[in-house]
Amino acid sequence: EVPYVSGHIHKNLLARVDDRLIEHNIGAVCGSWWRTGANHFQMLGPDAGPNGYAIFTIDGKRMQWTYRSIEDGDKQFRAYDMNEVARYYTASEDVAEFLAHYPERHDFREEAGGNRVFINVWCWEPAWKIRVTENGRELPVRREQTEDPLYVISYDIPQSVWKGKYPVDYGKRGKQHTLFTVDASGPATTLEIEVTDSF
């Protein structure tokens, strides 16, 4: 195997180019240029993963890696109750203004009552396993290419609505490759989420 490390796009991405070539694109320690933290939100990169860095451990020909957040180094994913996200989107004047300027962006108000849970696994790669159970019953997990609501609230809205500036490119951003969804049976059920890396 030939691994190589790249950066600059501020997102975490592991791409297996072929059977022997692996690209590790590492998100920046500054995330989205420190801007999400400046707004008293969590420090996030454009993939809505936390600011951080990668750690590579090499033992002979064997290599392992992990992503370490500057906030909680052991945390590898975040889950969202989309019923609660829909409530926030419905009540927020800032969200309404943002969506009025960018109607092509995902309107999470439509998630109300669906009992969906989003899971953002920021260093996900196809060799990882994501298992979600509800009362001992395994739920189907689907990968979804959409935007992360926390990043919209923490970065896009403060950089547009709060400043009264509406960059054209904000209408085309947002799709994340590290988001997964499950459907819970009800709004108050408990889910157990387990993410296992390739090691």
Name these PLM-found stretches.
Residues 90-199:
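Long, low-complexity serine/threonine/glycine- and acidic-rich segments characteristic of extracellular
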